[in-house]
UniProtKB/Swiss-Prot annotation:
Active-site residues, as the UniProt record annotates them: 83 (schiff-base intermediate with substrate)
EC number annotated for this UniProt entry: 2.2.1.2
Organism: Streptococcus equi subsp. equi (strain 4047)
Gene name, Swiss-Prot/TrEMBL: tal
GO CC terms of this entry: cytoplasm
Presence of the UniProt keyword Transferase in the record: yes
Upper lineage: Bacteria, Bacillati, Bacillota, Bacilli, Lactobacillales
InterPro entries per the UniProt record, alphabetical: Aldolase_TIM, TAL/FSA, Transaldolase_3B, Transaldolase_3B/F6P_aldolase, Transaldolase_AS, TSA/FSA_arc/bac
UniProt KW Membrane keyword: no
Reactions the enzyme catalyzes: D-sedoheptulose 7-phosphate + D-glyceraldehyde 3-phosphate = D-erythrose 4-phosphate + beta-D-fructose 6-phosphate
HAMAP family found in the cross-reference section: Transaldolase_3b
Record's protein name: Probable transaldolase
Length: 214
């Protein structure tokens, strides 16, 4: 399974990348806007830090607007993946871009049919949202399982990026269900390395060692 960082904070990306567990980065307009910096500059900086797919999202609403934006964004770096919203216009854009060899990440997927349509249109990645589905009482894990089953049954090349990840339990569950990737907010990465028993165990080891060395 691959781990992507769901942030545009360059310093956080740089620090977490040192752990050796980061395979890519995802961003969206909300994440970029929080940084208050130029979109292209931020994406290019991230590409220099992480050697893997870096998702950058279009903001146009029509297929024509998305395609024009995507062609420009794709020129920024070979690792850039263009994020496209799951709409009819987004599917049109994905179809054109996939034929041009531009990698796409179709986002805001909440149903099996949406994921299937995105894969049929040629999406490189599809991004079902875990936390947001839970918010409305839906079962995000069944969605992940169903999408993975369809990929395996029909041989689609698309990979599942489990998005809207909020807890370590989310990561653990989607890993067991076969999501290819979990994209994780930077604060959660630190929490995933921690457990009170680990902290207490290390403290005991150090105390025992200090007593032994006296």
């Amino acid at each position: 399974m691959k781990f992507f960082l769901d942030t545009a904070n360059v310093e956080a990306i740089r620090a977490i990348n040192e752990l050796g567990v980061v395979d890519g980065v995802t961003t969206n307009p909300s994440i970029i806007s929080r940084e208050g910096r130029d979109f292209e500059t931020v994406i290019k900086e991230i590409c220099e830090i992480v050697d893997g797919p870096i998702s950058a999202e279009v903001t146009g609403l029509t297929a024509e607007e998305m395609i024009a934006e995507a062609r420009n964004i794709a020129k920024w770096h070979d690792n850039v993946v263009v994020k496209i919203p799951m709409t009819t216009e987004g599917l049109k854009a994905t179809n054109v871009l996939s034929q041009e060899g531009i990698k796409t990440n179709v986002t805001l997927i909440f149903t099996v049919s949406q994921g299937l349509m995105a894969m049929k249109a040629g999406a490189t990645y599809i991004s079902p949202f875990i936390g947001r589905l839970e918010d409305i009482g839906a079962d995000p894990y069944q969605l992940i399982s169903d999408l993975r089953g369809i990929i395996d049954l029909y041989g689609f090349q698309a990979e599942i990026i489990a998005a809207s990840i909020r807890t370590a339990a989310h990561v653990e569950a989607v890993a067991q269900l076969g999501a290819h990737i979990a994209t994780i907010p930077d604060p959660l990465f630190a929490k995933m390395t921690e457990h009170p028993l680990t902290t207490n165990g290390l403290k005991t080891f150090m105390e025992d060692w200090a007593s032994f060395k006296k």
